[in-house]
Every structure is written in structure tokens, then in C-alpha cells.
Amino acid sequence: MLGAGGRHLAVGRAGRAGVGRRHPAARAARHHRQRQRHGVHLERGPGLGDDTGVGWHYIAPGKPQQNGFNESFNGRLRDELLNETLFRSLPPLAPCGGVATRLQRAASALEARVADAAGLCRSAHRTQRPACCVVDGCADRPLANPADHSSDQPRTLVMAG
């Protein structure tokens, strides 16, 4: 079987691809060293790189594509962990990452000038309580309005066939 660069590879008994008999040991060792990762690009400093002994350097200014894999991983992790669960209020969310602490920091950063948004909304809509006046949390509203049985989409004719 031909591997990268036309090199011959053989599959051993354990099912792993290894260097075949046509390669001398020196070429096999050099090939292995060339394929190893010698360093990583880091955005904010050494982090875990110092502990593992892997060489590192900062991402070059103006080269955001070097951080693309990290951002992709972070987005997928966020989708799997946070966006999968609907929280009805903030207390169940608190163990997920210190939300209360972040909210307190945000309020102190604004010098406690955070307005009561639900109260302002209720005073603006005195006759009835519309869907924008959610007090409990972000997932209190139903996904489909039970009072509205109409569709936004025009009806399509099904062809008889």
C-alpha cells in the first residue's frame, strides 16, 4: 500500500499502519520525526504548553485563520453543552459557569444603573401582557403560540398524481 509521498506502508497484525520492509530503520525514524508536531500557535500565552514541554508562539497579528480550529471547536462545544438545554430561569444555570457572578460584575460595571426591563415593558403594555414581558427567564414563552392557529406561509396545492 502506498502512503504519503509514495512511501510503502504495511498494515501489521494489530491493524495499525507501519513502515514496510522496504524502508531502512533510519528512514523510518526520520519519517516519524517529520510527522510529529513540533509546536503550537497560542492566542493568549503559554497556557498548558509549559507543562507539556511543547514549543509555542503567539498567533501572528492579522492572521485569524490560525485560530480557526479553536473557534470551531469552541462553537461546537457550546452547541453541545449550552444550547441543548432550555433554562427557565437563572438559578438552574448557575452551576453551569458562575452566571450569578458574571451578572453581578456586569451590574457593578454599569454602577447599578441596570433598568428593570420587565417593569418598563409592563408599563408600556398596560392593556395586556404580550410575549415580550417575560419575567422568569429566557425560555418561558412557548415556541408556538397556542392562540394563533394560522400559518405565516401561503398554502400550496398538492398535485394529484
UniProtKB/Swiss-Prot annotation:
Give TM segment ranges: none
Q: Where is the composition biased (Low complexity)?
A: 7-16
- Segments of this protein annotated with the region Disordered: 1-47
**Is the Transmembrane helix keyword given for this protein?**
no
Point to the regions of Basic residues compositional bias.
19-39
Assigned keywords, A-Z = Transposable element
Q: Which PANTHER family match?
A: BLR2054 PROTEIN, LOW CALCIUM RESPONSE LOCUS PROTEIN T
Q: What is this protein called?
A: Insertion element ISR1 uncharacterized 17 kDa protein A2
Q: Which organism is it from?
A: Rhizobium sp
